[in-house]
């Protein structure tokens, strides 16, 4: 069954062939189109810069992103991981787009205590794609728990989305071709399982 996939690509090297992340994005898109999925791509660094979130009302740019997300079955957000978070442009995108009451509402129980109720994105799928420069064991055992769990709290805990991960380790400029191809095959398999 054909699905609509919204991709928010957060890397300053977004042109084809310019980065490992761009290769992941392009492989994902090529495989998705072969299967018959529809792609809605934004390159965050190629878009008008989003203002820092200030708690105010969303502007037309944010409302457009939200409309496109509502029309999609799957959202994929891609970014390298720097200092235990996604890069600042991607984090700012998340902070501005996934806010209440659009993404979730709060059910008040007592005073300031309550819980989130998913809204516009409930039961959609979120694929979180992050790349790390460090080795798999160190990051998977210790460090990557921080960004992975925070994003899961946002997309699953608050927004009610089903979360899947696409993680890559030891993403360095001198990556051997064999490892690169192994990563691209992982991307293709992820798309085939959607």
Predicted segments, located by residue:
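A structural preference for short, hydrophobic beta-strand core positions in alpha/beta folds
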Residues: 40-43, 165-167
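N-terminal beta1-alpha1 ligand-phosphate binding loop
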Residues: 2-35
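A short, flexible beta-alpha/helix-coil linker loop
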Residues: 11-14, 47, 132-137, 170-174
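Short hydrophobic segments within beta-strands
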Residues: 8-10, 42, 129-131
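Helix-loop-strand module that forms the ligand-binding subsite of alpha/beta enzymes
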Residues: 57-152
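Glycine-rich phosphate/pyrophosphate-binding loop and the adjoining helix
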Residues: 137-194
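N-terminal beta-loop-helix "entrance" segment that forms/cooperates
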Residues: 41-60, 178
């Amino acid at each position: 069954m054909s699905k609509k996939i919204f991709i928010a690509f957060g890397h300053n090297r977004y042109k084809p062939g310019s980065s490992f992340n761009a290769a992941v994005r392009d492989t994902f898109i090529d495989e998705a189109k072969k299967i018959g999925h529809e792609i809605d791509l934004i390159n965050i660094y190629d878009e008008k810069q989003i203002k820092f979130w200030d708690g105010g009302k969303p502007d037309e740019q944010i409302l457009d992103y939200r409309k496109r997300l509502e029309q999609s079955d799957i959202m994929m957000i891609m970014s390298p991981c720097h200092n235990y978070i996604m890069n600042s442009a991607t984090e700012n995108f998340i902070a501005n787009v996934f806010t209440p009451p659009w993404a979730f509402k709060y059910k008040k129980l007592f005073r300031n205590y309550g819980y989130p109720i998913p809204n516009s994105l409930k039961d959609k799928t979120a694929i979180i794609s992050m790349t790390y420069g460090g080795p798999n064991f160190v990051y998977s055992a210790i460090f990557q728990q921080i960004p992975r769990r925070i994003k899961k709290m946002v997309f699953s805990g608050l927004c009610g989305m089903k979360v899947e991960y696409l993680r890559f380790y030891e993403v360095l400029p001198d990556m051997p071709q064999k490892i690169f191809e192994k990563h691209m095959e992982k991307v293709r398999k992820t798309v085939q399982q959607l």
